[in-house]
């Protein structure tokens, strides 16, 4: 029985990404939001908060299975943000309450400022490994657990954008050493995730969304030539971090433009990054947003090379209206041309 289950899971993992899939993050249930607020007020301790998280994640996984998905995730329910919690667990990274926030379309996301406090590294088992193990226990012959983490490029971007550059320079005289240290940290986390049974890893990467935004030159304080260099730096750190990943671990990149209170952080088609991102990044698949006009057309998909797969993000989470089924089918056929 156990051998059959292991074999079935191996077959399942070869099918990643699946014909219908989801990114991985879900809206927090009310009881989780209440528990987190109580924890921040000192009314709950860490163990009590974890108990509520466990309960909410168990219920979420049951819903994912009930809906017929082959992927299960923890909904990122244990995180304050989709990306920064991961960074906070690295050596040499600090955070504090923000005074300015992160700009989204129409509002500021008041999430912690995150910055270097020393050399970057991972000297112990990353908390996300234990988070993954909790979801892994719910795998069965029909499902594979997916772990989402921010891409190495996202981590690097956090530390080299103009607002962070001066602080980062206190610890790194150039980006090369920083790239190597971040990549080395990721290699350890990925190896530990693999040892815990992870075969489905997703790198969430908003850095490419920033690069295609009309304001990209301002974001990175550079010109067109400089933006191309940033692209090459980002794809290099991503490739360095996943270099040598075992063949049976599927690695995908999810290119995101942000989602906070159903609004976005950046806009722009994939045209300007397609050549570098789709031709040079050594991943197995891409999860790409195409849920509204901000994402542009499907033409850049012509640059996706080799055996890489593409998951089309055609169903939006930013508005409650359900998409027209025939319109979605038509868009799939349109994308298939490229």
Residue ranges of model-derived segments:
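Short, small-residue-biased leader/transition segments that mark boundaries at the very start
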Residues: 1-6
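Domain-level signal for soluble alpha/beta catalytic cores
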Residues: 11-338
